[in-house]
Amino acid sequence: MFRYLTSGESHGEGLYVILEGVPAGLKVDLDYINHELSRRQLGYGRGERMKIEKDEAQILTGVRGGFATGAPITIKVKNRDYENWEKFMRTTGEIEPGREVTVPRPGHADLAGGLKYGHKDLRNVLERASARETAVRVAAGAVAKLFLAEFGVRIYSHVLRIGSVEVEYPGGLPEEELKKADEHPLRCLDAQVEGRMLKWVDRARENGDTLGGIFEVVVFGLPPGLGSYVHWDRKLDGRLAGALMAIPSAKGVEIGDGIALANIPGRMAVDEIYYENGHFYRKTNKAGGLEGGVTNGMPLIAKVSLKPIPTQVKPLKSVDIVTKETKPAQVERSDITAVPAAGVVGEAVTALVLMESFLEKFGGDRIEETKRNYQNYLQSIANY
């Protein structure tokens, strides 16, 4: 069974992830993991934290000589800002006063988390709830991408919307175009539309505001048959949507044409099936590569809508949990928009879900065993 668990706080010593079930023999490329971490820090409109942190991974366990041993893999991403926070975040001894939070920020987990766990200092909530945690999800996702690459699977993301400025690509984008997303400051592939997006970000910065948007994840090279239609909790679209919704600020997930399919007649909402040269195919991909919770061999496409980051430079009204007086909400460092970076996180969590699905389908304690099972499956469907 493949699974992962993260730990750590935003201003603690570091962030950690443990991955269990990675097949022995998989090549684990530290440079590639660090490359993926650097991609998460890309994007116009990022906050001051990105000037402090240059995320780099340390592989602590489960890898020897660059290859997975089959034991749990532990990865650490150090928080460089910890040296400024050690006296406020140390795990033993007394915590020095000065960084307490008693005024919750609307739109964050602060108040709900304080009520749930009984914290009187809401820093205990916001430190763990912070989007900083996604750094180790990206590190874990990099390992999953390395695994999927062994089977020819490629994952990309790009930005479709910032604020009210949106670009549409009827029929989707070719893989060669998607490879270029990181060359653009907002990871939007339409330069003209991106120019308008950049102006929106600048305007939001001037106004002390934040912006949400939409990113899209596209996966090529998946075989048909991942996931299941047999039980609700094994449907791949449900599991994928859950992982994408767990990205901070995510408020909606669409698979394929998603919500737009609700507005058209049924005959226009499905992808007709054709057969030629020994294989089944479709001329359209409105389903986004998933039918009945199972991959159908077409590219997997998912869109994620993000709300604006709720932390505001001009704080909103809140209530002090100690005095119960109305006060301005706590102000923390924040991005103007995190949509470009969230796309990279989206790639990572998609890769993790797909790796889990691959190992459920093909098994294998060793990567050679998984590959052999995969090739046998491809042969069986070729003869269908």
From Swiss-Prot:
SUPFAM superfamilies: Chorismate synthase, AroC. GO terms for cellular component: cytosol. Its EC number is 4.2.3.5. NADP(+) binds at residues 40, 46. InterPro entries: Chorismate_synth (IPR000453), Chorismate_synth_AroC_sf (IPR035904), Chorismate_synthase_CS (IPR020541). One of its GO terms (molecular function) is FMN binding. Pathway: Metabolic intermediate biosynthesis; chorismate biosynthesis; chorismate from D-erythrose 4-phosphate and phosphoenolpyruvate: step 7/7. It comes from the Bacteria. FMN binds at residues 128-130, 292, 307-311, 333. This is Chorismate synthase. It comes from Carboxydothermus hydrogenoformans (strain ATCC BAA-161 / DSM 6008 / Z-2901). The gene is aroC.
